[in-house]
């Protein structure tokens, strides 16, 4: 059974997308099957960080709406075992049904060793979607007062939800 790991931050620009791409790539290079999901709807960049700019036409909402399956996730052109589901460009996080997203992640646990979710910044609906079904959350911050305050607030919310 695979693990779902969300990479999150209370603030933008902390490096969560870069970390998600790097950890996913390293795990895949070790022979693990890895699915990276960009959950930053409207501001997706995980494809760029993975060196797959505009090469991942399948979004996670395509899977949720059953237009595609997890097996259709875009394979990385150079790194074996690494796959990407991009974020939809026009969807709003509030329009995504959490239970459908959770069911997709449960299916991903069966097909992949790791599912890495690149969460949007902040604590809004996109953040809640990304972390609700995660086994673990990696919280990213940079050493400045605003980032540290936002990280503390985000950690508090995660702690209240019992997501570590």
Give the ranges of each region predicted by the language model.
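Structural motif
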Residues: 6, 84-86, 116, 138
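Asparagine-centered polar/low-complexity signal
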Residues: 22, 45, 161-162
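P-loop/Walker-type NTP enzyme "switch/lid" segment
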Residues: 36-110
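Short coil/turn connectors at secondary-structure junctions
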Residues: 1-3, 30-33, 79-81, 111-112, ...
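Short, ordered loop/turn segments at secondary-structure junctions
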Residues: 12, 39-42, 88-90, 121-122, ...
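Conserved catalytic-core segment of NTP-binding enzymes
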Residues: 99, 103, 107-110, 114-164
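Walker A/P-loop phosphate-binding motif and the immediately C-terminal alpha-helix
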Residues: 2-39
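Active-site catalytic pocket residues across diverse enzymes, especially alpha/beta-hydrolases
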Residues: 27, 31, 50, 158
């Amino acid at each position: 059974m695979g693990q779902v790991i969300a990479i999150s931050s209370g603030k933008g620009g902390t490096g969560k997308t870069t970390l998600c791409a790097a950890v996913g790539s390293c795990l895949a290079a070790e022979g693990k099957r890895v699915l990276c999901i960009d959950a930053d709807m409207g501001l997706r960049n995980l494809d760029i960080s993975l060196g797959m700019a505009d090469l991942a036409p399948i979004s996670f909402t395509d899977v949720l709406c059953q237009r595609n399956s997890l097996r259709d996730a875009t394979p990385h052109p150079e790194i074996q075992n690494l796959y990407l589901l991009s974020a939809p460009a026009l969807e709003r996080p509030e329009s995504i049904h959490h239970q459908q997203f959770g069911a997709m992640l449960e299916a991903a646990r069966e097909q992949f060793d790791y599912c890495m979710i690149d969460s949007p910044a902040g604590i809004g609906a996109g953040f809640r979607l990304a972390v609700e079904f995660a086994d673990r959350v990696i919280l990213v911050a940079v050493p400045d007062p605003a980032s540290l305050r936002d990280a503390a607030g985000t950690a508090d919310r995660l702690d209240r939800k019992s997501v570590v």
